[in-house]
């Protein structure tokens, strides 16, 4: 067992959201943290001492997912308002908006090269978008219920998705077809992702399980049941050797995938934990949940061994490199129960410099002629029962989520800038939005016509060439 100096430690915590944290992501350079919340806001936290935090105002409903682009120059967010927004992560808050789906959008994910964005929605579809042209490319339809998550493989050749239809599907991005399907008769996966080498996927189950699958041989490799509540999120360490899980039982757990066992149980949140993510280098990880707190942890464990493994896995991200055959996981499926010889860490939520943990917040309103937001008068849903009901199967809720639990009311929103402060009347913005939608449809129609015209010209050219060859042959015979 690791010594105390190698155990994870709580480094900082942040408070600024007024409702449950739904998603978070650390920037590629490790200097910023983006968080999404049930309060409809996106927040950007800077790790520099005394730096100001930014609160992005614009989404009309719960922000369900957030992710930095691979270069850190863009921030994508998904919302129950059926849109996806791309933000520039600075104080200007400039953004572009996709009218992405016909139902709430549950997840966003950039490809490793940053050229594509995958979105998953409750309209049962996955959509892929071009970031270069900022336009829709294609849809993937095979799920029969809400799609909760969709992730690119490290080489961009595959997409994995999970749905409330109790299936996990693997999609080929070249032919846009479903090439593999994993099903479960008990529960559905809340979250799914590829390991850094792209050879395996892991799923976070509503049935309290974590499963690891080999996508090359289509077999279940590992099965963990270490939580007492639904598992909401997972994150692979960049080395691929560790997996961290977030659960409605209020804990984070760290699994050693090489040895196939639980090594740490982290208790810091009060209530369900909805999201967790390692930094790109693996030295940090962050977590968020129903208590509205964002906790930043320092990893510490296996620090010496991870650097070489991380470099080896990063090399596999090249598009010409197939998955490495030296898989790190056991070859036969076997279940794992929680073991006694694990380390339990329950930090006191106290940081020496509280001012750093709760920095001043700058509200950034989104002004853009291509999008509109609702007027003031929004009320926040309760951060306990309703948030949990959205993320979890009601039958699998932890006691903190049940209606009988005493719930604290959310804070008043009157101190935040509201949309009614805009000088543009709502009727005008509605008209502008309608015009922009029609222009988008017109642009897509023109693009399709251009493609058809190109095909027609190519066919006509072939006909003329064949005709010329035929005339030449006739003249030679005569």
Curated annotation (Swiss-Prot):
Keyword annotations of the record: Cell projection, Cilium biogenesis/degradation, Coiled coil, Cone-rod dystrophy, Cytoplasm, Cytoskeleton, Disease variant, Phosphoprotein, Repeat, WD repeat
Entry-annotated residues carrying Phosphoserine: 321
Keyword Repeat part of the UniProt annotation: yes
Repeat positions for WD: 16-55, 58-99, 101-139, 142-181, 183-223, 226-265, 268-307
Record-level GO cellular component terms: centriole; centrosome; ciliary basal body; cytoplasm; spindle pole
Keyword field contains rRNA-binding: no
Coiled-coil residue windows: 431-470
Description of how the protein assembles with itself and partners: Interacts with POC1A. Interacts with FAM161A. Interacts with CEP44; the interaction is direct and recruits POC1B to centriolar microtubules. Forms a microtubule-associated complex with POC5, CETN2 and FAM161A. Interacts with CCDC15.
Family to which the UniProt record says this protein belongs: Belongs to the WD repeat POC1 family.
Disorder association: Cone-rod dystrophy 20: A form of cone-rod dystrophy, an inherited retinal dystrophy characterized by retinal pigment deposits visible on fundus examination, predominantly in the macular region, and initial loss of cone photoreceptors followed by rod degeneration. This leads to decreased visual acuity and sensitivity in the central visual field, followed by loss of peripheral vision. Severe loss of vision occurs earlier than in retinitis pigmentosa, due to cone photoreceptors degenerating at a higher rate than rod photoreceptors.
Protein's UniProt name: POC1 centriolar protein homolog B
Organism this protein belongs to: Homo sapiens (Human)
Lineage start: Eukaryota, Metazoa, Chordata, Craniata, Vertebrata
Gene assigned in the entry: POC1B
């Amino acid at each position: 067992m690791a010594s105390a100096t190698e155990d994870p430690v709580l480094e900082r915590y942040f408070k600024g959201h007024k409702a449950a944290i739904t998603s978070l992501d650390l920037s590629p350079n490790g200097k910023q943290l983006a968080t999404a919340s049930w309060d409809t806001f996106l927040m950007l936290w800077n790790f520099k001492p005394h730096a100001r935090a930014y609160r992005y105002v614009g989404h009309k409903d719960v922000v369900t997912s957030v992710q930095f682009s691979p270069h850190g120059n863009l921030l994508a967010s998904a919302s129950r308002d059926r849109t996806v927004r791309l933000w520039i992560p600075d104080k200007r808050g400039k953004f572009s908006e996709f009218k992405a789906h016909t139902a709430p959008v549950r997840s966003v994910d950039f490809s490793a090269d940053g050229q594509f964005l995958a979105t998953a929605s409750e309209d049962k579809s996955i959509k892929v978008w071009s970031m270069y042209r900022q336009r829709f490319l294609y849809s993937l339809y095979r799920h029969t219920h809400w799609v909760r998550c969709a992730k690119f493989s490290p080489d961009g050749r595959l997409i994995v998705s999970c749905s409330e239809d109790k299936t996990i599907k693997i999609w080929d991005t070249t032919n846009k077809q479903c090439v593999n399907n994993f099903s479960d008769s008990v529960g559905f996966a809340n979250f799914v992702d590829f390991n850094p080498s792209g050879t395996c996927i892991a799923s976070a189950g509503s049935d309290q399980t974590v499963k690891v699958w080999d996508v090359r041989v289509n077999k279940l490799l590992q099965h963990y049941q270490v939580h007492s509540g639904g598992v909401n999120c997972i994150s692979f360490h960049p080395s691929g050797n560790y997996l961290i899980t977030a659960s409605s039982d209020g804990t984070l757990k760290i699994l050693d995938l090489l040895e196939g066992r639980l090594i740490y149980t982290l208790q810091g949140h009060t209530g369900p934990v909805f999201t967790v993510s390692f930094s790109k280098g693996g030295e940090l990880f962050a977590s968020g949940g129903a208590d509205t707190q964002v906790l930043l942890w320092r990893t510490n464990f296996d620090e010496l061994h991870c650097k070489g493994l991380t470099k080896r896995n990063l090399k596999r991200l090249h598009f010409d490199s197939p998955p490495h055959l030296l898989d790190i996981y056991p070859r036969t499926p076997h279940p794992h129960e929680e073991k006694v010889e694990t380390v339990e860490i329950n930090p006191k939520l106290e940081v020496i410099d509280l001012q750093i943990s709760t920095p001043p917040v700058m509200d950034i309103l989104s002004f853009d002629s291509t999008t509109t937001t609702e007027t003031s008068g929004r009320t926040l849903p309760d951060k306990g029962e309703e948030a949990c009901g959205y993320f979890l199967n009601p039958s699998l809720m932890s006691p903190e989520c049940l209606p009988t639990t005493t719930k604290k009311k959310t804070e008043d929103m009157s101190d935040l800038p509201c949309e009614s402060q805009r000088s543009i009347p709502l009727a005008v913005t509605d008209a502008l939005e309608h015009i922009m939608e029609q222009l988008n449809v017109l642009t897509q129609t023109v693009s399709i016509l251009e493609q058809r015209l190109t095909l027609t010209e190519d066919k006509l050219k072939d006909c003329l060439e064949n005709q010329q060859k035929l005339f030449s042959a006739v003249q030679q015979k005569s």
